[in-house]
Swiss-Prot record:
Name of protein: Phosphatidylethanolamine N-methyltransferase
Principal location: endoplasmic reticulum
Composition skew (Basic and acidic residues), residue ranges: 38-52, 338-351, 789-802
Entry's EC annotation: 2.1.1.17
Keywords, alphabetical: Endoplasmic reticulum, Lipid biosynthesis, Lipid metabolism, Membrane, Methyltransferase, Phospholipid biosynthesis, Phospholipid metabolism, S-adenosyl-L-methionine, Transferase, Transmembrane, Transmembrane helix
GO CC entries: cortical endoplasmic reticulum; endoplasmic reticulum membrane; perinuclear endoplasmic reticulum
Enzyme class: transferase
InterPro entries cross-referenced by the UniProt entry: Phopholipid_MeTrfase (IPR007318), Phosphatid-EA_MeTrfase_fun (IPR016219)
Source organism: Uncinocarpus reesii (strain UAMH 1704)
Taxonomic placement: Eukaryota, Fungi, Dikarya, Ascomycota, Pezizomycotina
Catalytic activity of the protein: a 1,2-diacyl-sn-glycero-3-phosphoethanolamine + S-adenosyl-L-methionine = a 1,2-diacyl-sn-glycero-3-phospho-N-methylethanolamine + S-adenosyl-L-homocysteine + H(+)
Lumenal side: 1-85, 131-195, 245-277, 322-392, 436-462, 513-571
Amino acid sequence: MTDPAVSPLGCDGLRERRTQAPKETITPASLDPLMSKMRTDESSTVEPEKTTFGRTPDGTVFTVPHTRDMVSQLLSPSEPKNLSDILVLSILALHLLLLRALPTSFRIPVFAFIFLSWRAAYNIGIGWLLHMQSNHRTLVLWARKLQLFVDPSTGENRHPLLYRFIKRELETKIPENYSFENAPIEYNTWLVFRRVVDLILMCDFTSYCLFAVACGSRPVDEGFFMMLLRWSTGLSLVLFNLWVKLDAHRVVKDFAWYWGDFFYLIDQDLTFDGVFEMAPHPMYSVGYAGYYGISLMAASYKVLFISILAHAAQFAFLVLVENPHIEKTYNAPPPRKRVVDPDTALHEEPGSRSNSFNSDATPPMSLPGTTQPRSTHALVGSIDFHRVTDLSVLLIHLLFFAFTMVTPSTPIYRFLFVLNAALWRIWYSAGIGYILDRQSARKSWTRHFVKFGEGQDEAWRQWQGIYHLSMTTCYASFIAAAWKMYTLPQDWGYGLAILRHVLGASLIALQIWTSMSIYESLGEFGWFFGDFFYDESPKLTYSGIYRFLNNPERVLGLAGVWGAVLITNSRAMIFLALLSHTLSIAFIQLVERPHMQKLYGRSLRRDAGLVKSIKRSLPNSLKQFQGSVDKILDESIDFVEEVIDTARPKLAAGVNTFVKDTTALFHKYPARITITRLEPDLAGYELKDYALSVEGTELTQFNKSGGETKEKSQSSRGSENLVFEYGAPIKVKWTAPLNHSKKDWVGLYMVTHNSSREITKVSSQGRWVATNEGAFDSSTSEIGLKSSDISEHSQGKNGKSREVASGEMVFSGDKLWWNQGVFEFRYHHNGKHNVMAISRPFEIRIAKFDENEIPLDNHGVVRPAIEAALLPIVQNCLDRDADIAPQNSEEAFGSQVDRDSKYAKRVVFAVQHMFGIEFAPEVVCADGSVRNLAWRICNAKKVLAPYSMSRSSGTTTPVQED
């Protein structure tokens, strides 16, 4: 019987639940796009029956008469009976008589053969007829060739008796709104086909029930309670099966029940609720629950196995017959797009590509987008040993297989295999979950690849490989552990050994089918959590298995794990199953659910189809109780989330404090192992004669043109804070008494590193310059020294002038900290750490680049502004060396940048704080110019833009202010 809700169709169709479409007047012209109007109503209210119009393949439109279901026609005394009904009932009676007449020893094999024959007539016979009708219109052609429905009065019908017999049979069954002579040949052929189907289906079910009766017995030593439980469970399954069939017929009517769309199409409003919201393919999935209920009541493995065989044959019928017809009828490929006229393309205006750059200005790289990637070489379902991921999976699995086979099943090895499976499950759920959580919150995974100059697509490919390897290895380790814990039963007939294996295998098959259904619904993109990586316009759809369950992986997705528990009958496997289920639920609740709520918000569906169906069937008292339980659970979850949210900042603050303290300790560590050298005798040196003043390039915010305004900052500017540009040279002017030591030196320190103003206790780590040449045995001490011991007069506080020595030095390059913070210079005496003078504190800061304040160019791009802002910073990072630093954005960096990584490290630090993008130093070397680096920054900002917290005034959707 046709399942009207089985196909994951992308267009409107009989088998797809869609929203109700507005009614239109039915005319032959409007029936051309008939299937586009075959809508379904999500509500459970059944409207009064309306006239249904049908259309044949040649376009003939006719009124479809109302027909009754098979069981009512055959068994209801109020329904008129004809010869075909009597024939069907007689054959059913022969089955009953045969069961009574056969000896007990022959009943089981005979009825097994009879049932399998009728099942073959169903799945193979009817399947072949439908296949031929779908592809070649065979049944209609047979009827036309035999002229079965041609009036004998025309002289063209060679079988007048058969004509009158068929006419009487059909008109007896359809007394209203039906004319045998005027009905299309497709409709009459379908009615005759129905009678054949009635015979096969009734005999199929009857022979199955009689086979179960023949096999029925009571197990030895079965207690009354077990017998009561067995029969009550079996009857419940049979009643549930009966409800499924009746509800399905109520929804789909005879048209879908008897595969009417193989003959003609109809236009009607169907109500797909009830059973069609509970499970996919309900006629072929939960619609066979009664078979297993009968098997349970019969207490026979023979009935169970023949039920499984019949169920499998029915799924084969679905896959080989129905689904191809559904795809062909309701999911036809779209018409080919029209090819653009070449003449039109030649006349396209050059300026039509407003977002393109000149070829000489654009680096030879493609811009990765933020839309969903097109999968041309899927990772799931295709094995390619040219790919690292597939080869790694193969090698690891071969290693697992070999290690599992060669090691004995001793307790220590079993423990190791279970431990290995547990660790892989923890990584697969907790480790992968942490990566996705950080990706959802900060896009950390993507940022890592952007840091090394890669794009979003590379991050996506690497993530696919990691996830695929983790998933397959997790299950491979679980299978290996199950193999080690499994022992063959010594007596298959003892206890529930066979049942455990059958149920376990069924659960494993259920998990495999669930995984396939999830992948079919989500595709490669959804399978690998693509919405964590790509910012498409959020559009949530519920198709395939997700029409019935919100999270199928919560239960059905782990059915095979519990199947392994049943098969192995091991407590260790129970532990692994509980661990797997707990971690999977935690993954859904803590990772998937928050991301889905953030991404889709209120468009998330609260109840799936199955939950809706169950809730509608509950009494009001249970509904209220269920609502109270849901409220308690929601409040508990909210409380836990609130506690976590409250504790997170404190934990983060504690971690940050620990990191800062540790960092400061490392900064101070050289001083802890170095004895501070102090000058014991400072007599004759007046501290008032020592002084330090600083000059540097003052930092200003970027102006509207994208550049920077630079001024010289003097120490005489009063109380105004000094803020210097990152990497810019800093000039220091010092004064000291004429008799100052020739081994005096000036060091650069962070203000927070020294608590004492008399003694320096922290090493300068090479950031110092001597006041005089030749005073130290190191040439680096003189780098930056400009002048020394220049006599000048200084005005004292008492107004008296005195002669002092002065000098200048410039701190640049390696003499700078290349960090942000507040710094100071300290003047030290005679090569020791006595502090004679301290400069005014000043701050080194990197200005944030705000693209909202930068006007776009003619192409809507901010890259020129980024180039202008980046150029002076890069020049500073390259020491303003004419052999290394570029003079403009197009000029390449000097070769020294490739040889010494310190230059690239300075640049990436500046870029990170300036634009909020972290690159690896290798990116700077690879780009080789400011222009290419600016392009990469634009590209990275485009990739990371969806995760930016700042409002943009660019070309994105405007945000309405309150």
